[in-house]
Amino acid sequence: MSRLIFEHQRRLTPPTTRKGTITIEPPPQLPRVVPPSLLRRVLPFLIVILIVGMIVALFATGMRLISPTMLFFPFVLLLAATALYRGGDNKMRTEEVDAERADYLRYLSVVRDNVRAHAAEQRAALEWSHPEPEVLATIPGTRRQWERDPRDRDFLVLRAGRHDVPLDAALKVKDTADEIDLEPVAHSALRGLLDVQRTVRDAPTGLDVAKLARITVIGEADEARAAIRAWIAQAVTWHDPTMLGVALAAPDLESGDWSWLKWLPHVDVPNEADGVGPARYLTTSTAELRERLAPALADRPLFPAESGAALKHLLVVLDDPDADPDDIARKPGLTGVTVIHRTTELPNREQYPDPERPILRVADGRIERWQVGGWQPCVDVADAMSAAEAAHIARRLSRWDSNPGYIRSTSTGSATFTTLLGIPDASALDVASLWAPRPRDEELRVPIGVTSTGEPLYFDLKDEAEGGMGPHGLMIGMTGSGKSQTLMSILLSLLTTHPADRLIVIYADFKGEAGADIFRHFPQVVAVISNMAEKRSLADRFADTLRGEVARREQILKEAGRRVQGSAFNSVAEYESAIAAGHDLPPMPTLFVVADEFTLMLAEHPEYADLFDYVARKGRSFRIHLLFASQTLDVGRIKDIDKNTSYRIGLKVASPSISRQIIGVEDAYHIESGREHKGEGFLVPAPGAVPIKFRSTYVDGIYDPPRAEKSIVVHALPQPQVFTAGRVEPEPDTVIATGDVEVHTAPPRKLIATIGDQLAAYGPKAPQLWLPPLDEPIALADVLAGADVEPGQLRWPLGEIDKPFEMRRDVLVYDAHTAAANVLIHGGPRSGKSTALQAFVLSAAALHSPRAITFYCLDYGGGKLADLADLAHVGSVATPLEPERIRRTFGELEQLLRARQRQGAVNRTGSYTDGYGEVFLVIDNLYAFSRDNTDTFNTRNPLLAKVTELANSGLAYGIHVVITTPNWLEVPLAMRDGLGLRLELKLHDSHDSIVRVAGALRRPADSVPADQPGRGLTMAAEHFLFAEPALSDIAVINARYPGVSAPPVRLLPTDLSPDALAPLYPAPETVVIGQREEDLAPVAVDFANHPLLMVFGDSKSGKTTLLRHIIRTVRENSTPDQVAFTVIDRRLHLVDEPLFPDNEYTANIDRVLPAMLGLSALIEKRRPPAGLSAQELSRWTYTGHTHYLIVDDVDQIPDTPAVSGPFVGQRPWTNIVGLLAEAADLGLRVIVTARATGSAHAVMTAPLLRRLNDLQATTLMLSGNPTDSGKIRGHRFARFPAGRGLLLTDTDTPDHIQLVNPLGDAALSGNIGNNGNHNRGGEYR
């Protein structure tokens, strides 16, 4: 059966209706009656009594005193009484109330006429859109046939009859006081008007089947079928077969009730035929209909679902009470499918009504709907259509078919993106034709939608001077207005028709919506920047990019103009004229910048208002065009931005005032809300121009390419066939062959993606004006490979510096030759400080040998530097648990510094000859380091001063300092100037930042992301990112230098033999007692100048061993005439140590006092005699040997007076204490030992120890309990290995030393002392 193509035309304009709100003034209020007070009620009566009294008095006196004044006075009082009685009454008079009531009733009559006018307009519009069923037969073949599109309000709204419908205009009464105070007659009149006029009586009403998944119809079969026929007749008359399909399953399909459906093109099955033509969705069973509908229902989402592109809606009629409506799709409902099921089963009384699946009852010409309370009237007068009338309409429609080239869209009706641009198939673009050169007048001029008259709306981005609307524009639209849809339409039209050498785009969305990300792969798109609200660095980067592009274009115009014409070009137009004249210049494409949600950007970054103003002013000449888009317009924030815009686009806005600000009138506010009105707006092409109403094309939907036409060939002679509603089988000798049809197996793709992929594969990409931010980690290997740094130059890369203004990234390079060779890295917790040090060390090691660079590390930052301990370039890694290694590290570096200062360690070849090369002291976490090794008197680590010295003095001698700290304030002031290279990572508090930008409202530190370790700022406020090191590279680097490593840090031995320090007696009375930790030099005690020595330590700390070493060394290097010993050894530890003959050794306490008295008497004799002259005194010297008083464990000897014997009342140390101050001159040497525990108290109470401490005797503090609160000369004891201690001289500068162990050889030989005690293993005692 052949059909004619129905040519669609633009829909006739229906009668207009006025919407909005009709505000009604409230009725007048009755006056409130306030009861008078008692005084006001009584006062008139008192005045009357007074008047009567006066008159009586006048007559009682014979009226002799009557005068005109006296006669007038009673009348005045009478008038006053009357005024009080009447004037005090605040009641409104009846006449006034009547007058106000009459005025209000006249006002209501005017309102009633206005409301009736609204109702009449609404009725006319409804009658136009939903005429009587009898009128439908006149529609086929006219312009109104199939007039409804998805964008129309009445799309898929099917008339069901007549009913009272609400008035479109809302009636609102202004706020009033309590209704009790209203004038009753006026109030009743108002209530009557509202009750009557709020509805339009007996108006056409319909069912919006787009919002219904199922309609259950109950009633007599004939009556229900008549109603359903009326609904279907409405549907097929107004809706194109491409937008609406009809399907039926009825046992009596061939009866007159439904056989007429066979004539409708809406029931055709696509690409399928039977013996008489197209197959039909008409079956006798639900199962058969389900099978036939399966392809059409396969990919539909569940009901309800939002869809950008309208699906073909299906009306599925089941005229079978026994059928299951859910059996059609075996699901509760599908989008775009409405099942109309006629049944006889009444709903259960407890059944809850479903608004998406209504149950209707057709009876007595009415339609009722099942609600919670039972059946409620739905349609007062139901439409009904006989089978004959329906067949008549179907036959009239049967001759027509829809135009396959007429594509309908929810946005623009028949005008789509592809039709407006003349693209037959967006999946097979002719890019060469689309990007072909065009005249300047046609450039940047593209259709983006249609106007209210159906004409294409052209968006011309060119400058006004070139005939366009630009260069800059403003678009405002609230949420749901279609702002993103309009922006996408503009972008896609421009990008589809312009190559990258004519147009490039930057899309910036501050709010973070990802809708524009689909444009990211277009070749003309420089960048799609989203989520700037959460990543402030993106906003700063965007600003730098705009400033940089303005500067770049200005520089290009200057250089090209001077080369071509001797002076700079004033604009890109002159630049392009030079290209047209034959000069070889690169193209300069127009830059189109879309700033979406720019008001939110200005709220967070107010300084960007000046940026946009600057770019808008300068960009006009440089072809940088800006389109500002937002949901609202904050005049206070945007400053002069709106003054720099020429064209305006106003979509649906939130208030009339915003509409007036954008387009000059309130029309943008009155745009209707709803999905069907998205993308509607007004374009003002120039200031003061008349707004043009338009609707933008919808480009964000799935694109379905046009399919090849399917031909049906019948190879048989024509034979008459009976045309039935059901399937007609072909004749036996008839063969139906179908042509090959292309099957699209690819997944659905959006139109934008379909076009973007083709453009990306064809054309060159835009210049790289935007580099992605430093969000992704950078491997150190990649940085080393990409950096232009030669090995061995004492320069190595650390990461990358981001320079969006120059539109490039530079390598962050450390240069040891510059003044910035000392490095400070400061950042908050987990900011990547330790990883940065790893990158620093590994990068240097990758380019230098261990002889050229060495590292010595102090790991206070959590252990990451310890991972570098195996690197050949690392001499040592010390942790806070290794204080000795830390001290030795500084000792080695100080010794190296002194050596290089003495000999200027750089030879003629420019390298160091001491084997260390360039030395780096690396301290991770200076804050923790500075608070280590502290006490009450030393709140900072004493070693911090050595770091400061190295930072300030070591640079000239190849010694560098690299430190990290959580806070710049933790760096000592004296050290700061020596730290030339300062890198700042993310800080806990941006107020601690030392990076400043002049004139900036915000600190640059605020823009550093918190979740990206290694990201930071240079002192020039440039963002950088440290490279990510790989510890697996350590083995690779070590393999390059087999057998070569950095000099290790030498530690003090735990068992020091005398041979290691020979000679032990380098000068008279100078005894080498051990080795100093700082420089590993021998430590000697010069008893001639420092005759007093105190040794404190706990058991087995080395006290007695030191005494043994001193005795042995002095005895072996002296004669009995030179030296004598007095040894007091309470515990017999020194009994086996031989002395000179006649020397005193005692372990008996009773012998201590006589020995001390004899020694003191001997020493006293060495004083010069009285009567010597000054010259004799200057030449006076004592004669005799030097006497060494050695007391082991002096704290064990009681200092109490003797209670018996010849020395009653005398103390052992009294006479010796008086000689200590002159011990050096009198040849007395005093060496005492004592326990560390309690020693602080002992030096304050014991006479001998107190005097020695007062004289600043040389003090050796061996191992002791650190929890002991006592201190010796400001120093607390610590746990040391045996023989290790702290030596305090008269300068109070402590030296950590290791004592000589003279017992080592004896222990190895197994000697046994004279007292029978075995020296176990050569232990210190």
UniProtKB/Swiss-Prot annotation:
Residues covered by the FtsK domain: 454-660, 808-994, 1080-1268
Lipid metabolism is among the record's keywords: no
Matches recorded under SMART domains: AAA (SM00382)
Gene3D superfamilies, sorted: P-loop containing nucleotide triphosphate hydrolases
Keywords of this entry: ATP-binding, Cell inner membrane, Cell membrane, Membrane, Nucleotide-binding, Repeat, Transmembrane, Transmembrane helix, Transport
Complex formation: Part of the ESX-3 / type VII secretion system (T7SS), which is composed of cytosolic and membrane components. The ESX-3 membrane complex is composed of EccB3, EccC3, EccD3 and EccE3.
Function: Part of the ESX-3 specialized secretion system, which is required for siderophore-mediated iron acquisition and for the secretion of EsxH and EsxG.
Name under which the protein is recorded: ESX-3 secretion system protein EccC3
Species whose genome carries this gene: Mycolicibacterium smegmatis (strain ATCC 700084 / mc(2)155)
Gene: eccC3
